[in-house]
Curated annotation (Swiss-Prot):
This is Probable beta-glucosidase G. Beta-glucosidases are one of a number of cellulolytic enzymes involved in the degradation of cellulosic biomass. Catalyzes the last step releasing glucose from the inhibitory cellobiose. Glycans are attached at residues 41, 59, 107, 228, 277, 337, 344, 351, 403, 500, 509, 554, 567, 588, 627, 683, 719. It is found in: Secreted. It holds the Pfam family Fn3-like. Keywords: Carbohydrate metabolism, Cellulose degradation, Glycoprotein, Glycosidase, Hydrolase, Polysaccharide degradation, Secreted, Signal. It is an enzyme of class 3 (hydrolase). Residues 1-20 form the signal peptide. GO terms for biological process: cellulose catabolic process; glucan catabolic process. Belongs to the glycosyl hydrolase 3 family.
Length: 819
């Protein structure tokens, strides 16, 4: 048993380790960085600038299939002392990134919480998978599930009970957000599907999923408050940025994918650093009690992001259930040896400030998914190597003995290398392929350019950008520790040997390439190589928003210098997401591939695509504009005033993000949302829609809330069928996409079209197949702010199906509710 006074000690130690990781946000920016200064006279919050109070925090009922596990959790809670209850909701320093200590007398071994969304970050002998944005670019439900399941297997085998992912916040409001790559797509529907498939994969493997960051977490700059460190507790100078989001936008954009997460029975959800409509994410009763636990019927527990707890009693009453990592404070503040939770929970119950029943519900929410997933039955112990790599809470900060007696450095990778290679290849997006430059056909000579082509030079773990070495993951808590990383140059050399390619030249110094006459100074041969491969990259990380949308390390200049000398220049980008591509129409740039962050099999996966072993079938999960200045919804990077509440981010674009914005304003783009080429061709035909229910009303029947909300919203009401044919000469996969245009009766501000269905189909030459899209009630509904419910508008819906958001071949109409 740990006393209240003991609980107060370790908060300092855990939090100090967190501060050292420098994930705080609001870091300094270079002189030429993109800047958006908040306009003056916006510091007085508007109609949606104040988050309304919603109390009390709803109790869990175990609905959705957790009833038996809830009964087990109730029996467990009934045996706890008050001090043990405080420990159950408060993190401590230990071997994992987050730790809930064991209670041996109840045979509870504690909880190990581990980063992150593409790998187990603090361990060895584990795989590094492709990033979320890469997985989303596959537009493949099977890949999304398999990736989640394989990661879940590795987390479990290392003894982690909770995987801190996947990510739906940021959604991708801004092209500049530093963490877009951790998430999936700049669209709520595609992100929602990716969340659901990934969570089901994690949890089918026996690991709790923790979707994050709830909600409106769309920028890194000023995500935490600034403090006067000289004050006893660190007086706040300026509060964290507030994401100010209107009710309809909240529901139709930012809450949408979290509804999928809850529908998938996610065990936990992480609340975010920043404020939402004036209140911090982890003490916002409207978002936690009202939206998440109330409207969506979430049955699991809400944990704080690391250092995102700003209060004890207020946060608990507002719906927060677990404090991580357990110490008092937030990033940038001098931590002291107390916890907002911990001993303060005990004190608050004893003095009547908190009802013990609320603490009981917090623990029921924590333990119900634990029992539901069978984590009380022969669960693997924590790998001791985890502690060796965990700089978040080094061993000398631990207050408890974690009895790490299991096998050290256990290899949990299994056969996942082949899976990672396949997934990354199939997610690669072919943006340009002039004159069928790809696939390569045993070229006689090759030249490889760019610092992204080579082996990494800074070791297996990189939390900051690096000049030399291929980029396979971003930085921050969402990164991974490579046991190996196959570079493009290594894989190309291996393939060249196999093909008897006579010469593979390479230049890795971007400055040298960009400032040279490539033909005269570098190639020094009378005729250019058969193909020139240029590898360029763009870093992004937690804690800082992107400063520009250009390629890093003079990448554009490198491409242009090579293209000036080589009439078959093939460009591969390893990027966190959106890039400006001013060379896209250069006549000598014959092919462009967006490979995003592919994980440890980077080189092998791109060579599979370059040589045609895999026909690329990735599609863009965002829009690539003609110019960086064409994007809307910038992050707030600075303010001109010094008031405590002055950091505001006004989501006044409302529903118009990414393709919705470009479509609404008829802005030409370079490559549209959903775009991607193949080495073969496809056709779509014969669209028809079928109503599958007899009667459809505008409002859903008022039914008991289940995980995901009103179950009526998840019922299919229409099927839309099309025929897809491979009209080319080689096998390939394509992604038919369905977009809905709402009737004119829908309120103003509705986007011209919205993604509401997709499927990936693989076909042999000449083969055809039927694709059926199931449209649920929620897919045809908008959020009505007056009645506070989802409504299907009266009138005709236009249904379009095609191969991208701007290549829609087949059209039909449906009328669910007549005028």
């Amino acid at each position: 048993m740990t006393s209240a006074s003991q609980i107060l000690v370790w908060g300092l130690l855990a939090a100090s380790g967190a501060q050292a990781q420098n994930y705080g946000g609001g870091s300094s920016r270079s002189d030429d960085a993109f800047s958006y200064v908040q306009p003056k006279n916006t510091t007085i919050l508007g109609a949606y600038g104040h988050s309304p109070a919603v109390y009390p925090s709803p109790n869990t009922t175990g609905s959705g299939g957790w009833e038996t596990a809830l009964a087990q959790a109730q029996d467990f809670v009934a045996q706890l002392t008050l001090e043990e209850k405080a420990n159950m909701v408060t993190g401590q320093p230990g071997p994992c990134v987050g730790n809930i200590i064991a209670i041996p007398r109840l045979n509870f071994s504690g909880l190990c919480l581990q980063d992150g969304p593409l790998a187990i970050r603090v361990t060895d002998m584990a795989s590094v998978f492709s990033a979320g944005v890469t997985a989303a670019a596959s537009w493949d439900r099977k890949i999304l599930y398999e990736r989640g399941y394989a990661m879940g297997q590795e987390f479990k085998a290392k003894g982690a009970h909770v995987a801190l992912g996947p990510v739906a916040g940021p959604l991708g409001r801004s092209a500049y957000s530093g963490r877009n790559w951790e998430g999936f797509a700049a669209d709520p529907y595609l992100t929602g599907v990716a969340m659901e498939e990934t969570i089901q994969g994690y949890q089918d493997a026996g690991v709790q999923a923790c979707p994050k960051h709830f909600i409106g977490n769309e920028q890194e700059t000023m995500r935490n408050p600034t403090f006067n460190d000289s004050a006893p507790l660190g007086t706040v100078i300026q509060e964290a940025v507030s994401s100010n989001i209107d009710d309809r936008t909240m529901h139709e954009l930012y809450l949408w994918p979290f509804a999928n997460a809850v529908h998938a029975k996610a065990a936990s959800i992480m609340c975010s650093y920043q404020r939402i409509n004036g209140s911090y994410g982890c003490e916002n009763s409207k978002t936690l009690n009202g939206l998440l636990k109330g409207e969506l019927g979430f049955q699991g527990y809400v944990m704080s992001d690391w250092g995102a707890t700003h209060s004890g009693v207020a946060g608990i009453k507002s719906g927060q259930d677990m404090d991580m990592p357990g110490g008092l404070g937030a990033y940038g503040q001098t931590f002291i040896n107390r916890s907002f939770f911990g001993g303060n929970v005990t004190a608050a119950v004893n003095n009547g400030t908190l009802e013990e029943s609320r603490i009981d519900d917090m623990i029921l929410r924590i333990m119900t998914p634990y029992f539901w997933l069978g984590q009380d039955q022969d669960y693997p112990t924590v790998d001791p190597s985890t502690a060796d790599y965990n700089t978040f809470s080094p061993r000398n900060t631990w207050y408890q003995d974690f009895n790490l007696t299991g096998e050290r450095s256990r290899d949990v990778r299994g056969n996942h290398a082949a899976l990672i290679r396949k997934q990354a290849a199939e997610a690669t997006v072919l943006l340009k392929n002039k004159n069928n430059a790809l696939p390569l056909k045993a070229p006689k000579t090759l030249a490889v350019f760019g610092n992204d082509a080579s082996d990494i030079t800074n070791g297996p773990y990189n939390d900051a950008t690096y000049e030399y070495g291929t980029l396979a993951a971003g930085g921050g808590s969402g990164t991974g520790r490579f046991t190996y990383l196959v570079s493009p140059l290594t894989a190309i050399n291996a393939r060249a040997q196999k093909d008897n390619t006579s010469l593979v030249q390479f230049w890795l110094n971007n400055t040298q390439i960009a400032t040279s006459d490539v033909q005269a100074d570098l190639l020094r041969v009378p005729t250019p190589p058969t193909a020139c491969l240029v590898f360029v990259k763009t870093w992004a990380e937690e804690g800082a928003d992107r400063e520009h949308l250009r390629l890093d390390y003079n990448g554009t200049e490198v491409v242009e210098a090579v293209a000036a000398a080589c009439n078959n220049t093939i460009v591969v980008t390893h990027s966190s997401g959106i890039n400006e591509l001013p060379f896209a129409n250069h006549p000598n740039v014959t092919a462009i591939l967006a490979a995003h962050f592919p994980g440890q099999e980077s080189g092998n996966s791109i060579v599979d695509v370059l040589y045609g072993d895999v026909n690329p079938s990735g599609r863009l999960p965002y829009t690539i504009a003609r110019n960086g200045s064409d994007y809307n919804a910038p992050p707030t990077t600075a303010v001109t005033t010094s008031g405590r509440e002055d950091w505001q981010s006004w989501f006044d674009e409302k529903l118009e993000i990414d393709y919705r914005y470009f479509d609404a304003h008829n802005i030409p783009v370079l490559y549209e949302f959903g775009f991607g080429l193949s080495y073969t061709t496809f056709n779509i035909s014969d669209i028809y829609a079928t109503r599958v229910v007899d009667s459809i009303t505008s409002a859903p029947e008022d039914r008991a809330i289940q995980p995901g909300g009103n179950p009526e919203l998840w019922e299919t009401i229409y099927n839309v069928t099309v025929s897809v044919t491979n009209t080319g000469d080689v096998e390939g996969a394509t992604v038919p996409q369905l977009y809905v245009t709402f009737p004119d009766s829908t309120p103003e501000g509705t986007p011209p079209k919205q993604l509401r269905g997709f499927d990936k189909v693989s076909l042999q030459p000449g083969e055809s197949t039927k694709v059926i899209f199931e449209l649920m009630r929620r897919d045809l509904s908008y959020w009505d702010t007056v009645s506070q419910q989802w409504l299907i508008p009266e009138g005709d819906f236009t249904i379009r199906v095609g191969f991208s958001s701007r290549n829609l071949k087949e059209v039909t109409t449906i009328t669910p509710v007549s005028e």
